[in-house]
Amino acid sequence: ATQGQVITCKAAVAWEPNKPLTIEDVEVAPPQANEVRIQILFTALCHTDAYTLGGKDPEGLFPCILGHEAAGIVESVGEGVTDVKPGDHVIPSYQAECGECKFCKSPKTNLCGKVRAATGVGVMMADRKSRFSVKGKPIYHFMGTSTFSQYTVVHDVSVAKIHPDAPLDKVCLLGCGVPTGLGAVWNTAKVEPGSIVAIFGLGTVGLAVAEGAKSAGASRIIGIDIDSNKYDTAKNFGVTEFINPKDHEKPIQQVIIDLTDGGVDYSFECLGNVSVMRSALECCHKGWGTSVIVGVAASGQEISTRPFQLVTGRVWKGTAFGGFKSRSQVPWLVEKYLKKEIKVDEYITHNLTLLEINKAFDLLHEGQCLRCVLAVHD
């Protein structure tokens, strides 16, 4: 009944940086060619939402509708959309996959260039405009997803169709944090059995790295965090040892080198802190150690180390969305979840509603939650 019509619904709008979100009645325009309008049922909060709200994102535009880790049902589709239809269960993905660009054709990457020129500036490709407005004022999109809304419009290349049996209040997490951690291990680092792994930052992504490392057969999984309370939870995800840098006089990389007979085989930085990125590289074993940057640093920051670290055989890499090609591989991750081969439920510590979104951001900042899932229509 709503097809082709403007839908008015509730959404949490970020009017300016560092201010609480406000629940507004938002008009959501119908999808244009190659666009999909989705009824979002559940969305989770990720640190990237807080990072952009905090004004640290070079691509952050205001006012906008944040949110990028979600699940829902297709409400309608624009002209030319063939891969999904109304009623399909889907996960929107900020990491598009068109299947045609040189990135998509390469097995070496999951980055897709098709809609990046639009999603990077908060609009849609078809007309370089937004599909959201409040009282006639346009509201920018965020990461091509904008899931803190009861309805959103996304490019068709950014929609993964998933198994209808999957519980949407759980698999919404497969839109960002969990695949990012698992894929950093499986796709980017390609951790082998028997490896020693170090993980800096034990939030959702760090724990997903631990889970991925455990399933890859790592022999030691060392968790590093300045909050010692995180160790108990981390054990459930595969972390075998814990170090709090605050408990040591020596630099953390030296502490790790001493504990591992020269360093780790793989390290993962899951914080977005450039000085920690250096420690993560330098705790790697000479000759073969690989460090993967997973965390997103604030705009304008630079990484540094001595070239000798790389000359003597260490490798520095980065990853986005764990190297997973979204439309082809998110459905596979959902199947793995349904077969109980990967954890998802265990990352969810809080369940709130969209109306309580500012409370959810507070929990995130206090470090009291892993993932908080919001019921968008309650």
From Swiss-Prot:
| Chemical reaction(s) catalysed | a primary alcohol + NAD(+) = an aldehyde + NADH + H(+); a secondary alcohol + NAD(+) = a ketone + NADH + H(+); S-(hydroxymethyl)glutathione + NADP(+) = S-formylglutathione + NADPH + H(+); S-(hydroxymethyl)glutathione + NAD(+) = S-formylglutathione + NADH + H(+)
Cross-referenced CDD domains: alcohol_DH_class_III
Q: Name one GO cellular component term.
A: cytosol
InterPro entries to which the protein is assigned, alphabetical? ADH-like_C (IPR013149), ADH-like_N (IPR013154), ADH_3 (IPR014183), ADH_Zn_CS (IPR002328), GroES-like_sf (IPR011032), NAD(P)-bd_dom_sf (IPR036291)
Q: Where in the cell is it found?
A: Cytoplasm
One Pfam family from the record:
ADH_N
Residues recorded as binding Zn(2+) 2, renumbered to this chain, are 98, 101, 104, 112
As stated in the Swiss-Prot or TrEMBL entry, residues carrying the post-translational modification N-acetylalanine are 1
Q: Which cofactor does it need?
A: Zn(2+)
Leader sequence range is: none
Keywords noted in UniProt = Acetylation, Cytoplasm, Metal-binding, NAD, Oxidoreductase, Zinc
Return the similarity comment: Belongs to the zinc-containing alcohol dehydrogenase family. Class-III subfamily.
PANTHER family, per database record: ALCOHOL DEHYDROGENASE, ALCOHOL DEHYDROGENASE CLASS-3
> Assembly and partners?
Homodimer.
Q: What is this protein called?
A: Alcohol dehydrogenase class-3
Origin organism is Pisum sativum
